[in-house]
Amino acid sequence: MAEESTDFSQFEEERNNDQYKVSAKKTVDEYKNLDAEDESLAKWKESLGLSSDVLPLEFPGDKRKVVVQKIQLLVNTEPNPITFDLTNEKTIKELASKRYKIKENSIYKLKIVFKVQHEIITGLRYVQYIKKAGIAVDKIDDHLGSYAPNTKTKPFYEVELPESEAPSGFLARGNYSAVSKFIDDDKTNHLTLNWGVEIVKK
């Protein structure tokens, strides 16, 4: 099968035209000391995990701020999830050439497991561009949230995206390529993942 182009510039242009302005980034300590007497702000900081038990990095040499460890594709017609182990560079590279079969009209969703380190990440989003036969057919842009660095009591975060229904019909069947990105409010892209699915007949 010929490799499809991953040029999704038309979608990128839409995002780059966004006029939303992001405030200056603060360190973990700055957030912890911010308006200490403000009760509502204190609750917001607590919801981000900004407590006194924030621990040093497990791997001090790792400069990544968002580490996506695993993605699971949950399909209602399959007994077990399809799991992408993203801690392995070889697995990440192999995903681009694989196509995971999903039956038409199936209900599916993604579960993302990740950790945050070094600093608070705000406005993390999962952005996915989808092509079929070289033509851009869809874009997904889901808000994941804002997160403080993980601790021993919270070693990772887990987020499930909304359910979707696989297309059906003769024209809808076939191979779809996807490019997934994890982008924050600073427009930092923490991971780009190339993968794909094949929609098959029931």
Swiss-Prot record:
The keyword Cytoplasm applies. Keywords: Acetylation, Cytoplasm, GTPase activation, Phosphoprotein. GO terms for molecular function: GTPase activator activity; Rho GDP-dissociation inhibitor activity. The modification N-acetylalanine is found at A2. SUPFAM superfamilies: E set domains. One of its GO terms (cellular component) is cellular bud neck. Present with 1670 molecules/cell in log phase SD medium. Regulates the GDP/GTP exchange reaction of the Rho proteins by inhibiting the dissociation of GDP from them, and the subsequent binding of GTP to them. Belongs to the Rho GDI family. This is Rho GDP-dissociation inhibitor. It comes from Saccharomyces cerevisiae (strain ATCC 204508 / S288c).
